[in-house]
Curated annotation (Swiss-Prot):
Originating gene: ureG
This protein's name: Urease accessory protein UreG
Alphabetized GO MF terms: GTP binding; GTPase activity; nickel cation binding
Residues binding GTP: G10, P11, V12, G13, S14, G15, K16, T17
Database matches in CDD domains: UreG
One GO CC term on file: cytoplasm
Organism: Deinococcus radiodurans (strain ATCC 13939 / DSM 20539 / JCM 16871 / CCUG 27074 / LMG 4051 / NBRC 15346 / NCIMB 9279 / VKM B-1422 / R1)
Length: 213
């Protein structure tokens, strides 16, 4: 069986690992799943997910890239490919595999040879102007996640402005690539990400995700 492979990218501190923890908890009873994390010199994200008991430890694998993590998910994904193959060998029924890596809006795109789809996580604390700047992560990711909406009042960010700018950047002709707003502390928006995975990627008969606010 070939699992659906979903890349999870975004800057350090944007909430990628926290999102993975939530998604694993929500999906582990529905699907046979695993996670690969990428770090430059450590296995910190692997340890965080293991300590949180997001999945059984053997289902959480860390890749130490020794350089910019985006290289290991785009230019030379061999380390990740080997880890994918190892997980498939150990878990033949694997249905869903998340591959997480840090990187900014320009660097954090995934090779189509490594993943079937990818999402990009950005942080409201970066300011309301961030979606307006565009870039590959914001424009071309299969799903844009605008995280930490609870911080908007603290940094003077207007979520309505971010929504309008994200919609403009994500528009492709008559279509708008999906994007969601999340607050992982309250769980807001998590259902929309799961709906995207199940409706858009796994083709389950579920309600499609709502776009934007």
């Amino acid at each position: 069986m070939t699992p659906l492979k979903i890349g999870v990218g975004g800057p350090v501190g944007s909430g990628k690992t926290a999102l993975l923890e939530v998604l694993c908890r929500e999906l582990r009873d529905r699907y046979d799943l695993a996670v690969i994390t990428n770090d430059i010199y450590t296995f910190e994200d692997q340890r965080i997910l293991t300590r949180a008991a997001a999945l059984a430890p053997e289902r959480i694998r860390g890749v130490q890239t020794g350089g910019c993590p985006h290289t290991a998910i785009r230019e030379d994904s061999s380390l990740n490919q080997e880890t994918v193959e190892a997980l498939q060998g150990e878990f033949p029924g694997l249905e869903l595999l998340f591959i997480e890596s840090g990187g900014d809006n320009l660097a954090s795109s995934f090779s189509p040879e490594l993943v079937d789809a990818w999402l990009f996580v950005l942080d409201v604390a970066g300011g309301e102007k961030v979606p307006r700047k565009g870039g590959p992560g914001i424009r071309h990711s299969d799903l844009l996640v605008i995280n930490k909406t609870d911080l908007a009042p603290l940094v003077g960010a207007d979520l309505r402005v971010m929504d309008a700018d994200a919609r403009a950047q994500r528009r492709a002709g008559d279509e708008v690539r999906p994007y969601v707003f999340t607050n992982l502390k309250s769980g807001a928006g998590v259902d929309e990400i799961i709906a995207w995975i199940e409706h858009d990627l796994l083709f389950r008969d579920v309600t499609p995700p709502r776009v934007g606010l």
